[in-house]
Amino acid sequence: MALALLSLLNGLSYGLLLFLLSAGLTVVFSLMGVLNFAHASFYMLGAYAGYALAEPLGFGPALVLAPLLVGLAGALFEHAVLRRVHPMGHVPELLVTFGLSIVLLELVQLVWGRAPVDFRAPQALRGAAFTLLEQADGGLTAVAGAAAAADCAAAARCHPFPANRLFMGATSLLALAGLWLMLARTRLGLVIRAAQTHPQMVRALGHDLGRVFLLVFGTGTALAALAGVIGGSTFVTEPSMAASVGTMVFVVVVVGGVGSLGGAFVASMLIGLLQTFAVGFDQPLLQGLPGVPPALARWSLAQLAPVLPYLVLVLMLVLRPQGLFGRPSP
């Protein structure tokens, strides 16, 4: 029971981080029709910017300033480069953003090197947020923070939940709530939603679509950078983090339905829970079946966890190519 609860919380926190990262890409595509190939590179850039700012200023200011600076850089890129390429079609946009991803990767390696940097959350987030004490009779007791050694010794099992995981989920949730409020409750959000379906009408009413595109692209890159600060301090900050998380983001976007924010949320939760439960309940898949070679009989769910999102992607492309909430092509 405790293991299932911890796997659920880990899956939700990881899923919220994935959604925070994929939400920016989804909003940019739904409004501008741009599939930003460099989106994960802004995630990496946010992690390194947070690392650089955390040393002199502290983690809290870095958590705020790094997304703002990266979002400003994304807005400048949209204004100076992407806006000129946008009328040429999707292929030039993909090539330009792909080139940007290479430039950002080389820039990060030039400044910070290829090895991981020591970017960690503050001391307050390095311990346990709470501890689940599982009794021999199956009962559960939750203790705030790290449980005392005597309490762990008296319990059948002791399961701490990391504070940085709780912070990751809570911060992602707050940022996404702010994004929802902006899109659903403000005049700017009304203009953005109207521009998704009726851009010519929005322009005819006197709104500057170029300024809307600038703001949306900057917001999308800022969300990616915020996810980078959180994810980089929780997992690892290294140049390859963009490549490792970038494929996962595109899996989320395609499974949820390209351009669908609700679909990206459901897909993020699905993939986060699928991976964490596979690792948490590590069981041999083929053990005991007749005729199975010993090498295959040792395969476990944890070994297949990195592959499971891509299996979901393949099944989705076969059974429902438009994704969970996407619209079928006419």
Positions of the model-derived regions?
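Inter-helical junctions in multi-pass inner-membrane proteins, predominant
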Residues: 2-17, 182-187, 213-259, 276-285, ...
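Single transmembrane alpha-helix segments in multi-pass membrane proteins
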Residues: 3-52, 77-92, 210, 253-262, ...
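Helix-loop-helix "hairpin" substructures at the membrane interface of multi-pass membrane proteins
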Residues: 14-15, 153-238, 261-266
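Hydrophobic alpha-helical transmembrane segments
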Residues: 41-45, 60-68, 94-96, 166-170, ...
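Transmembrane helix-bundle core of multi-pass membrane transporters
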Residues: 84-85, 93-185, 212, 277-306, ...
